Curated annotation (Swiss-Prot):
Post-translational modification comment from the UniProt entry: 4'-phosphopantetheine is transferred from CoA to a specific serine of apo-ACP by AcpS. This modification is essential for activity because fatty acids are bound in thioester linkage to the sulfhydryl of the prosthetic group.
Known function: Carrier of the growing fatty acid chain in fatty acid biosynthesis. Has hemolytic activity forming pores approximately 1 nm in diameter into erythrocytes. Is able to induce murine colonic lesions and to disrupt the integrity of epithelial cell monolayers.
InterPro entries linked: ACP, ACP-like_sf, PP-bd_ACP, Ppantetheine_attach_site
GO terms of biological process kind: killing of cells of another organism; lipid A biosynthetic process
Organism whose genome encodes this protein: Brachyspira hyodysenteriae
Annotated metabolic or biological route of this protein: Lipid metabolism; fatty acid biosynthesis
Compartments, as annotated in UniProt: Secreted
Organism domain of life: Bacteria
GO molecular function, one term: toxin activity
Family designation: Belongs to the acyl carrier protein (ACP) family.
NCBIfam families assigned to the protein according to its UniProt record, in alphabetical order: acyl_carrier, PRK00982.1-2, PRK00982.1-4
The protein, known as: Acyl carrier protein
């Protein structure tokens, strides 16, 4: 499974989205998928756990959609 698709699955699970077609590469977690601040924290924590990375606070604020998350993970994955 491609990284983008894996991240979309994580987003769907964390945000309880049953219609995965809503989760596009550029759909904003907050504006388009209705995530709140707690959702974002939990999403980042799940990505950190799944991909064995640490995402500093200043970088977390830059991850606004699936494409941002995939780019960050590809650049920082061990």
């Amino acid at each position: 499974m491609a990284l983008i698709d894996e991240i979309k699955d994580v987003v769907a699970n964390q945000l309880n989205i049953s219609d995965k077609s809503k989760i596009t590469d550029t759909a904003s977690f907050v504006d388009d998928l209705n995530a709140d601040s707690l959702d974002l924290v939990e999403l980042i924590m799940e990505l950190e756990k799944r991909y064995e990375i640490k995402i500093p606070q200043e970088d977390q604020e830059k991850i606004k959609n699936v494409a941002d998350a995939a780019k960050y993970i590809e650049e920082h994955k061990k």
